[in-house]
Amino acid sequence: MQLDEIVPLGRGLADYRAMFVLRADDMARRLLGCGDGPASFNADWSAGGGRVVSLDPIYRWPAAAIGARIEATFPEVVEKMHADPGRFRLTGGRTVGALAARRWSAMQRFLSDYPTGGRAGRYVAGGLPDLPFANDRFDLAVCAHLLFLYEDHLSLAFHTRAILELLRVAAEVRLFPLVNLAGGRSAHLEPVRSALHRAGAHSAIVTVDYEVQFGARHMLRVWRPCPSEPIVETSNHEAEKKT
């Protein structure tokens, strides 16, 4: 993948807290943000004393190149947002313009932190389904706006392999959202949960206090029954349906 094929879009710490139900006691946990892109989550979580590593293919490039790509693509992103405001749940006086401003602010915060954070090892180039980390490196892995959302581009097999890989490096995984780009519940969701159950993992769908895209207000929480227990894909049981 080349940089000119990527449309960078970043979210802020408040978004991550709400999407993944992150609390103050999570500051003590070792976090992995998978597919974070130009989000300010790492910068602000780290500034507050938290421990987090962000992983994304875009981190192959320096700040100047990423910043130039954001400058080139963000006007079109905003234009599309204004062209289809019905996709967004805008309440309490919020507007598409205000939402776009939040995204822009988050990306500028990322760019200011990225050089220092990169040298500190907080930003690592890479992506699913093969992670460059040792087993049990993290306590919690979060992944936003990648799995399930792009079900037309990422196969069921990719989803299953990616989540099992996240479970290899972290005892718990949280994924948001569970809808596709059209706003419907992803067709991959229950087959993925079945595969995870067969592999020995537990999963639960959690309603969160966050809904920017209509219908996108659920997170999938996946965890190993015991942090030291390996997850091995098998082929027998039906998944538990937990809500």
Please place each PLM-identified region on the residue numbering.
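Conserved beta-strand signature within the Rossmann-like core of class I S-adenosyl-L-methionine
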Residues: 170-179
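Class I S-adenosyl-L-methionine
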Residues: 181-227
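Conserved class I S-adenosyl-L-methionine
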Residues: 26-37, 45, 52-56
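A short SAM/SAH-binding and catalytic strip from SAM-dependent methyltransferases
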Residues: 139-154
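A short acidic, Gly/Pro-enriched loop at the edge of an enzyme's catalytic core
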Residues: 129-141
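A short, conserved alpha-helix within the catalytic core of class I
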Residues: 150-165
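Class I S-adenosyl-L-methionine-dependent methyltransferase module
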Residues: 47-121
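Class I SAM-dependent methyltransferase Rossmann-like catalytic core
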Residues: 1-28, 63-65
